[in-house]
Amino acid sequence: MLKIAMIGCGAIGASVLELLHGDSDVVVDRVITVPEARDRTEIAVARWAPRARVLEVLAADDAPDLVVECAGHGAIAAHVVPALERGIPCVVTSVGALSAPGMAQLLEQAARRGKTQVQLLSGAIGGIDALAAARVGGLDSVVYTGRKPPMAWKGTPAEAVCDLDSLTVAHCIFDGSAEQAAQLYPKNANVAATLSLAGLGLKRTQVQLFADPGVSENVHHVAAHGAFGSFELTMRGRPLAANPKTSALTVYSVVRALLNRGRALVI
């Protein structure tokens, strides 16, 4: 049995608990949350993981088999780095956090000090295995194009680029590097950061973002070229019922990673 400490129990974390409910190989027996979210966390835990303890920090002498982060960027430094330094393997969903200068190196160094490993999840995008394999032979270009309905860009710099309320055709709100995209649109950085880390890096991965009234879901398109040949991938992601801003595939990515840790045969 694999015993897991989960950081965060919002839309992603609660959905993970639900999907793992009743699994005898993988058990979430610790859930780490912040004080202001404790009440709703305890409700979700009571329903889907009644034997789990709700904590605000992992004690220094507490050593789960695995830590999974489902809490957002701030949890990386607060919880994941200390766990890695203590030798506890970790799984990270908030890959966009690694767009910040030095964050990827911080995680890698913590894992090296703890003689363990941190796994970055593919989340809402597919093809990461192919892209990472292609990098071995040499990549020439990776271009990511993201499309969302105009209203999904409310509260972002896109509001200064165009009138989101009156768009009738797709409008490009950003065209540049993944590094620049992460700075301007940090809440939309996970997919671009994941592709960058698997492929050419933040500076060389190209990103185009569109506010598109013709789509009702998040559309991801990846085009990669290199010594291996080329590939193109288009995904139309449905949102999580509990949180329209979160991809359902992100939750499934977490569950798959955890189940793989507890099973003898994985793919």
UniProtKB/Swiss-Prot annotation:
Keywords: NAD, NADP, Oxidoreductase, Pyridine nucleotide biosynthesis. Disulfide bonds: none annotated. The active site is at residue 220. NAD(+) binds at residues 124, 190. Coiled coil: none annotated. GO terms for biological process: NAD biosynthetic process. It catalyses: L-aspartate + NADP(+) + H2O = oxaloacetate + NH4(+) + NADPH + H(+); L-aspartate + NAD(+) + H2O = oxaloacetate + NH4(+) + NADH + H(+). Pathway: Cofactor biosynthesis; NAD(+) biosynthesis; iminoaspartate from L-aspartate (dehydrogenase route): step 1/1. Specifically catalyzes the NAD or NADP-dependent dehydrogenation of L-aspartate to iminoaspartate. Belongs to the L-aspartate dehydrogenase family. The iminoaspartate product is unstable in aqueous solution and can decompose to oxaloacetate and ammonia. PANTHER family: ASPARTATE DEHYDROGENASE DOMAIN-CONTAINING PROTEIN (PTHR31873:SF6), L-ASPARTATE DEHYDROGENASE-RELATED (PTHR31873). This is L-aspartate dehydrogenase. It comes from Polaromonas sp. (strain JS666 / ATCC BAA-500). The gene is nadX.
